[in-house]
Amino acid sequence: MEIRTPAVSGTFYPGDENELKDLIHECFLHELGPGKIPPTDSDQKIYGVICPHAGFVYSGPVACHSFYSISSSTSKLAIITGPNHYGIGQNVASMVDSSWKTPLGLVEVDSESALELREDLGILELD
C-alpha cells in the first residue's frame, strides 16, 4: 500500500499530533471559530461542506465551522477534494490501495469508491 506523505505538515499546521490537537481545539474556541467544541451526536444530515485550506494560523478558526457542522456525522465515506497546486500530473486524480499520512494518523483511500467515481465521471485519473 502506498502512503502519501503530507506536503506542508509542520508549516501550514503542526507536524506533531498533540500540538495539532491543541491547535484544533483553540481554533474551535477562537472568536472567529464556532466558539465551542462540536457535539458528539446530532440528527442533522449533512451532504457536504466547503472548507478553506490555508495554514491554520490564517484559516483554522473559519475552517472549524465546516468541521463543527459534520462532527457528529455517522457517514462512512467522505469525499475530499482539493486543487492541484503545482499543475503537475492530472487535473482530477485519486489514488487506490493507498493512504494519506497525517499527524493524526493514516486516512485510507476507499479504493472501491475511487474506482466508481472514475467510471462515473470519465475525467478522474488514477495517480
Where are these regions (language model features)?
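Active-site histidine-anchored catalytic micro-motif
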Residues: 1-127
